[in-house]
Structure formats: structure tokens, C-alpha cells
């Protein structure tokens, strides 16, 4: 079963502001997640059904929610890890 990637409207705006090289790196990792989105080491505590993708070199993070019933990976937030901003933003959006 292959999952489909969808963006929340606000996450899409964040995505479009990213440098093309960073978008490509995230796209490559998201493509891998389409086959197996439930990666135990990437699971976020405190936010239900959410996982992260890390780009260590640039410090960017992408937070996505897995919706198994519809086979969807919903991108919740994209941003820098600094001060856990992207995780706090994702947590707010999931409420």
C-alpha cells in the first residue's frame, strides 16, 4: 500500500518559502515514507500519529501526520529546529 502526500495550507506556504535544494531533499525522503510512513525512530512524543523528517546539515525539520484510514501522509509543519519552533507549531496545528 502506498500513501499519498498532502500538505496543510499553512505547511504548503512554509514549503514554498524553502530553498529548492532543501525541497528536493525533503521530497526524496517523503517519497521513501510513502511506502512505510511509520518509522519508530522518527515518531514524535506528545503529538498523535506524527513523525518527523530531519535534514541534519541544514537544521530543517518536516512534521507529518499519518492518516491510515485514507492512506495519507499530511504535512503539518516545515521549519527550523531552533528552540523547537517547528515542533511547537505542529503541536498547535494538531489541536
Curated annotation (Swiss-Prot):
Disulfide bonds: none annotated. The keyword Ribosomal protein does not apply. InterPro entries: RelE/ParE_toxin (IPR007712), RelE/ParE_toxin_dom_sf (IPR035093). It holds the Pfam family ParE_toxin. SUPFAM superfamilies: RelE-like. Keywords: Plasmid, Toxin-antitoxin system. Signal peptide: none annotated. The keyword Transport does not apply. Belongs to the RelE toxin family. Toxic component of a type II toxin-antitoxin (TA) system. This is Putative RelE-like toxin protein.
